[in-house]
């Protein structure tokens, strides 16, 4: 049973509403991320344009992330969620429209991909911050799990669509329909449904103390022993996310595996993630002190995933490549726990600024690696995956340098 709006232990119905929106956002995001390379190749557009677009997008994020973080800490996360979700769907539609009419698509793709990254960041960061500030502290992990489970549902739907729509009908049709659905659901979610519960959460968000810029910086500086290793670990993890998201399916094609098989195993992965996420709400309630363990386990599964991909390429073993995706399924539980731990240490009032600093650092790494990874993939996919595996291993090792207890915040995770 759903809890009422002011429950200290349950999930506000508006979070369930946001979960529905997140399903369609994840559907559009997955269609774009896993389909853009194939979409470009099908329309005789060089994949390198995507690499240039990714790099430009990360550079733009460097300039906007701190400003967005300050806006979040000033209480504008709801407005940013609305803006990010609607504009993301609009730009996805423009990509379809531009490519379909053949109007200088190569140049416009370079412009559109950065916009997709920026609006994705606007929505995701604002959504996570809104939950952190507006949800009851004792139910924070449960709320995050609900949001991330909906993300898994959206991704699973996207893989079904990609298998039975993109290849049976048209990838263009998938792009345009998912973009229109996203904009429609966003308008419903934010302006027409669950208005009472929405207002309760917005009031809860506005009640969180709003520190000034200097105070936010001082707060983060006092947590540098936590923030520096965590952000560094995430930066190396991001290299793997970029590679897996954009090049897992094309790598399967390189190995002679049809996209339908790759998408089917990705679908199975996210179906497992949905089950784990549903069970994870109870796990997070019972193990709120596990803290750093969630971070380390999450990075460990990345190492396993990318290691299996590397082995599959070296030894040309198809089933290793397909099975590798399945090890991403515990991510819903582990990321929910890690995010709850993060908020407990950093504090709700500084969540936006921490996210901004984090995106700055990660953006630098992403800007440097996006185009090189794309270029290396076009030359030899095995080299690219070797780099990704090494980065994931470094990320995993760094997690053990994160302190395990923070008495000043009350967050005392267990190793």
PLM feature spans:
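Cytoplasmic helix-loop-helix junction between adjacent transmembrane helices
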Residues: 113-151
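Juxtamembrane intracellular "pre-TM" segments in multi-pass secondary transporters
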Residues: 1-12, 195-232
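Hydrophobic core of transmembrane alpha-helices in multi-pass small-molecule transporters
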Residues: 23, 105-123, 319-334
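A late C-terminal transmembrane helix in Major Facilitator Superfamily
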Residues: 349-378
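Intracellular juxtamembrane helix-capping segments at the cytosolic ends
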Residues: 122-135, 333-347
């Amino acid at each position: 049973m759903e809890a009422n709006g002011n429950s200290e232990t349950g999930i506000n119905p508006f979070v369930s509403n946001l979960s529905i929106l997140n399903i369609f956002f994840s559907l559009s995001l997955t269609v774009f991320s896993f389909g853009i390379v194939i979409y470009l190749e099908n329309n005789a557009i060089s994949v390198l344009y995507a690499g240039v677009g990714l790099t430009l997008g990360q550079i733009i994020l460097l300039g906007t992330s701190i400003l967005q973080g300050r806006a979040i800490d000033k209480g504008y996360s709801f407005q940013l969620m609305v803006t990010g979700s609607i504009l993301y769907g609009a730009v996805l539609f423009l990509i379809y429209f531009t490519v379909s009419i053949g109007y200088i698509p190569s140049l416009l793709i370079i412009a559109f991909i950065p916009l997709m990254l920026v609006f994705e960041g606007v929505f995701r960061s604002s959504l996570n911050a809104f939950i952190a500030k507006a949800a009851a502290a004792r139910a924070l992990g449960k709320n995050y799990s609900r949001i991330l489970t909906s993300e898994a549902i959206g991704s699973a739907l996207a893989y079904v669509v990609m298998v039975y729509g993109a290849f049976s009908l048209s990838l263009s049709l998938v792009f345009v329909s998912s973009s229109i659905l996203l904009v429609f659901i966003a308008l419903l979610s934010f302006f027409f449904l669950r208005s009472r519960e929405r207002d309760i959460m917005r009031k809860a968000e506005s009640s969180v103390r709003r520190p000034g810029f200097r105070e936010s910086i001082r707060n983060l500086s006092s947590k540098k022993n936590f923030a520096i290793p965590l952000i560094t670990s995430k930066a190396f993890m991001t290299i793997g996310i970029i590679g897996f998201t954009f090049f897992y399916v094309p790598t399967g094609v390189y190995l002679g595996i049809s996209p339908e098989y790759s998408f089917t195993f990705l679908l199975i992965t996210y179906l497992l993630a949905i089950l784990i996420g549903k069970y994870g709400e109870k796990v997070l309630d019972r193990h709120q002190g596990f803290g750093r363990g969630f971070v380390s386990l999450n990075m460990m599964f990345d190492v396993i995933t990318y290691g299996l991909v590397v082995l599959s390429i070296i030894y040309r073993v198809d089933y290793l490549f397909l099975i590798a995706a399945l090890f991403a399924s515990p991510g819903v539980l582990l990321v929910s726990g890690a995010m709850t731990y993060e908020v407990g240490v950093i504090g709700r009032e500084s969540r936006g600024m921490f996210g901004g600093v984090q995106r700055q650092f990660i953006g630098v790494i992403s800007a440097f690696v996006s185009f090189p990874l794309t270029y290396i993939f076009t030359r030899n996919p095995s080299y690219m995956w070797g780099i990704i595996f090494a980065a994931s291993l470094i990320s995993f090792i760094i997690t053990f340098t994160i302190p395990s207890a923070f008495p000043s915040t009350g967050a005392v995770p267990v190793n």
